[in-house]
Regions:
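Phosphate/nucleotide-binding beta-alpha loop and adjacent structural elements of enzyme active sites
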Residues: 1-239
């Protein structure tokens, strides 16, 4: 039985609306909300191992941008899988972000940013607040409301952290990938070794078409695992 499944089964008797996972597998306790999508996401990452795909240069993975970090489960997984990497975890929702900080508190290689990955710098808001927090969608908002969400670009992150090459860009941003990939994506895709994304055509029709059009500008080895499309830059073809 996989370690993730053993841990997941041990959760099932937890109470009080929270699952608290304590295991030597993790650097600190992991908190999941019982009524949100957290247990399902935990199962995807640690039981189904949907982010396990055998990066060809694992020891050389230096920078991971985790867009749509939710409560930090992917960041925790990436920290174990790529111990030499710095991970930038971006999450727009305040409640998710608080748990992201808590769940990664002992992971010194993880930096948490309360923002949304977007194609340009502007203020955003959640357009579907009736949904569970893992399914929030972003929309531009022309307002000075202090509760609005900061939209941040890939280029801004690269400049802020002096990143010259992104080892992995993980994107799970509930439809915002459509705007991201249809607006000059080549400028930063040229600096990505690996893109891992979940597409949401049922939220924004045409998302897949936009994504594959942008990706076609470069040579990728592409395959699917679970809900994710994994694209590895085909460096061997150009060496």
């Amino acid at each position: 039985m996989l370690p993730g499944i053993k841990i997941f089964i041990s959760l099932l008797n937890s109470k009080n609306g929270m699952y608290i996972i304590r295991s030597r597998v993790f650097a600190n306790s992991i908190v999941l909300r019982k009524e949100q999508s957290d247990p399902f996401i935990f199962e995807q990452i640690f039981c189904e191992q949907q982010y396990t795909f055998g990066h060809p240069a694992k020891q050389d993975v230096k920078w991971i941008i985790d867009a749509g970090a939710n409560i930090g489960l992917a960041a925790v997984y990436f920290s174990a899988e790529y111990p030499n990497a710095r991970i930038i975890s971006i999450e727009p929702d305040k409640e998710n972000f608080a748990l992201l900080q808590k769940n990664t508190s002992n992971y010194k290689n993880v930096t948490c940013i309360n923002a949304a990955l977007w194609y340009k710098e502007e203020k955003l808001d959640i357009s579907n607040k009736e949904e569970k927090s893992a399914g929030y969608m972003m929309e531009p908002k022309l307002s000075n409301d202090v509760d609005l969400i900061k939209g941040i670009t890939v280029e801004q992150l690269m400049k802020q952290f002096s990143i010259t090459e992104i080892s992995m860009l993980k994107i799970d941003i509930e439809g915002s990938e459509k705007e991201l990939f249809e607006n000059n994506a080549a400028s930063w895709l040229s600096k990505c070794d690996c893109v891992v994304t979940e597409l949401h055509d049922w939220l924004k029709p045409g998302t897949s078409r936009v994504f594959f059009k942008a990706m076609a500008e470069f040579d990728w080895i592409t395959y699917v695992k679970g809900e994710n499309i994994i694209c590895l830059k085909n460096k061997a073809a150009h060496s």
